[in-house]
Amino acid sequence: MNDIVYMLKDPLPDNGVELGYSLRSLKHMPHGKVFMVTPRLPDWINPYKVEHIHHLPTHQMQKWADLGEKWKWLGTNDVMTDEAIYMDDDYFIVRPVKKAGPRPTFHPLWVLIEYYTEKYGDVEIVRAMQNTERLIKEKGIEIPLCPVQHYPWPVVRSNIPVHWEDDKGPYDWKILEFNHNNPNPPEYPHENKVTDHEQLKRVIARGTPYLSSADDGSFVDSGLLSLLEQMFPEKSEYERD
């Protein structure tokens, strides 16, 4: 079975309450070992059930850059199954599935570049996106795409294109991986990211097996926390007693 890898920031908000429910939700998907790439494990994690990878980000590295380096590390270190499952701490599997997926949906990368440029100006993340777009085009892909993914992401580690790297970075390695391995990407489906009560109702009504919380601190206010408490009242093997 495929191993699961979480790439976690440190510290986690609210001592990792979202991660706890994400781990409990893994019972709905067949999987191998669970790896966590992070400087420190939360103190409530059972260290005997989780493989801890002490990947230390550069001091003061921004979140996107830290995650990019972890993706690059994923493609160069053979410590887990080659076919792995990428998880974030706010991905929840709310009903049984046979495997992770589908692969992420997308929008053109230039849309994201324009959004960040308008919002932040000429900052490092914008330059990294521009570098990423340039590199993808140099590889013969006319319209670089940006993955939109808020559910378990199947990834073949040996297909992460670390050989693409030149000396003109930094890059977003998650975007590079997506473009390298998706010659015929899927169409955009409904969103499953919850930001408020009404969206939560719509997601549940569609019968999606996955849920994800927003990045704006509305985890409790959205009603998702209360729902997960009802769905997963019992601790998983990955939590201390």
Residue ranges of predicted features:
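A conserved donor-nucleotide-binding helix/loop in the catalytic core
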Residues: G16-S25, L56-M87
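Conserved donor-nucleotide/metal-binding helix-loop-beta segment in metal-dependent transferases, i.e.
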Residues: V94-A128
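N-terminal anchoring/stem segment of glycosyltransferases
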Residues: M1-Q60, P183-N184, R206-R240
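Non-transmembrane alpha-helical segments in soluble domains
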Residues: L23, K27, F92, K174-F178
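Short catalytic/ligand-binding loop motif for oxyanion handling, primarily in non-cytosolic enzymes
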Residues: P13-N15, D43-N46, F92-V97, G101-R103, ...
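Short acidic donor-binding/metal-coordinating loop in glycosyltransferase active sites
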Residues: P39, M87-Y91
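Catalytic core and acceptor-binding pocket of nucleotide-sugar-dependent glycosyltransferases
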Residues: T117-S218
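Short coil/turn segments at beta-strand junctions that form active-site/ligand-binding loops
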Residues: N2, G32, M80-E83, D89
